[in-house]
Amino acid sequence: LMAERYAATAQQTASGSAYTDSSGGWVDPYNTFTRTYLVSLCKELRELGFDEVAFSYLQQPLAATELKYASQSGTPSRTDAVVALAKYLRTSLSATGLRVSAIVSADSILQEQAKLSGQDMTVLPKLLDRVCVFATTDNVSTLRSAIAADSSFDAATRFVPFLAKAPESGSYVTTG
């Protein structure tokens, strides 16, 4: 909604028009207003008692459209853009004690779409407190292994699979 209501924050195509897709508008991860707004919102959530924020869509659009970024010399990659925003959020929020996590795309990991999404699993797990992924019982082990490829990442406590169906074993509370 932000990109649609405040055009100055919108991610742009190479021609300078606002990028939109079936998800709606996307914000430019380098836009100063967007960054300031996200940090302010997170700080307010911390003051309200929240101890963690999980960003959804901390990624770039999956379309192959060429994108243009605000205030950048050169042409950063989509990964550069996502990592730069994650670093900014981590640095700006570290003093608050708020955990910074993200919901990443299983497609980015399993179908190797990270170059389009910008969600590089060799970098993001180092910047985030937790990595959350919508998973199935069939792919959860593969996702865990891919995200925890770096031995410094503790998958037991920092990998959070969101499962639509509870596994056969264990105790779970389910709805529906």
Predicted feature locations:
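Generic structural signal for well-ordered alpha-helices
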Residues: C42-K43, V82-R90, M121, P125, ...
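Substrate-binding cleft/loops of secretory-pathway carbohydrate-active enzymes
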Residues: S101-T137, V173
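Active-site-adjacent "subsite" loops/lids of carbohydrate-active enzymes
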Residues: L1-K43
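Active-site mouth loops of central-metabolism enzymes
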Residues: D21-Y37, A106-A114, S169-T175
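Active-site-proximal loop/short-helix segments
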Residues: D51-D80
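An active-site-proximal structural segment forming one wall of the substrate-binding cleft
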Residues: W26-Y57, D120-L124
